[in-house]
Amino acid sequence: MNERSAPIGVMDSGVGGLSVLAEIQRLLPNETLLYVADSGHVPYGEKSPDYIRQRLRHIAGFLREQGAKAMVLACNTATVATVADLRALYPDWPLVGMEPAVKPAAAATRSGVVGVLATTGTLQSAKFAALLDRFASDVRVITQPCPGLVECIEAGDLTSPALRQLLAGYVQPLLAQGCDTLILGCTHYPFLRPMLADMVPADVAIIDTGAAVARQLQRLLGERDLLADGPARETAFWTSADPDSLKKILPMLWMQSDRVQSFPL
């Protein structure tokens, strides 16, 4: 296998990163993808940075053993806790992380009020505070931690009345304060777009960073002459939880796949 045809590793604390995986496949259809769902340790948002760093070192080492030419941290919480650590550990390995879309949201808002839905870990991080200082000094940013949403999505619940009530409890206070731009600061949350679209006025912009991450990955691979010229092989999945659970939820969030294996804990 030459370097161009080597796979790209993508990880998340669970299934949320599938929203990013879809954007990567859309932009880079010739690339072979590997996906690790660390669902046995979800949610990351309530875990300590040291715990998350330990998990990410393990996952990164595994993906390198699989021959991954690059790694995407398709998880905001993992990015803020570990991306600097991983870049120091693997300085020549292309690494792409996630961050809430503060810059485009601050540019898009008309009311001057931006809402952020994210995990506690992301919202309390120094990296997020730096994003606000850099790009959002002229707008009001209202942050909303969203406990419970990740767990619902991990269980395959995208439509229940209980989920709708939970989500409305997070979104309605932001709208009441004049928010006209909503940042989805967790890769699980794009799967709630249909429900959100029913819940917010049509002129409220909903922004996530999946497509931007795919473009950044394309740029990094292009700079290193690592873009594949195809054809892609079938995506392989690993999970630190029950593989049958991931097999059941994949058709809802991605597509049917039997290539689901247990991730070595």
Curated annotation (Swiss-Prot):
Query: InterPro entries per the record?
Result: Asp/Glu/hydantoin_racemase, Asp/Glu_race, Asp/Glu_racemase_AS_1, Asp/Glu_racemase_AS_2, Glu_race
Task: Keyword check for Cell wall biogenesis/degradation, yes or no.
Answer: yes
Recorded superkingdom = Bacteria
- Determine if Cell wall biogenesis/degradation is one of this entry's keywords: yes
Keywords (alphabetical) are: Cell shape, Cell wall biogenesis/degradation, Isomerase, Peptidoglycan synthesis
Reaction(s) catalysed by this chain's protein: L-glutamate = D-glutamate
Listed GO biological process terms:
cell wall organization; peptidoglycan biosynthetic process; regulation of cell shape
- Molecular function, one GO term: glutamate racemase activity
* PROSITE patterns documented for this protein: ASP_GLU_RACEMASE_1 (PS00923), ASP_GLU_RACEMASE_2 (PS00924)
* Binding, substrate: D12, S13, Y44, G45, N76, T77, T187, H188
Annotated active site residues, numbered on this chain, are C75 (proton donor/acceptor), C186 (proton donor/acceptor)
- PANTHER family in the record: GLUTAMATE RACEMASE (PTHR21198:SF2)
For this chain, the family text in UniProt reads: Belongs to the aspartate/glutamate racemases family.
**Annotated protein name in UniProt:** Glutamate racemase
Species annotation: Pseudomonas entomophila (strain L48)
Gene name, Swiss-Prot/TrEMBL: murI
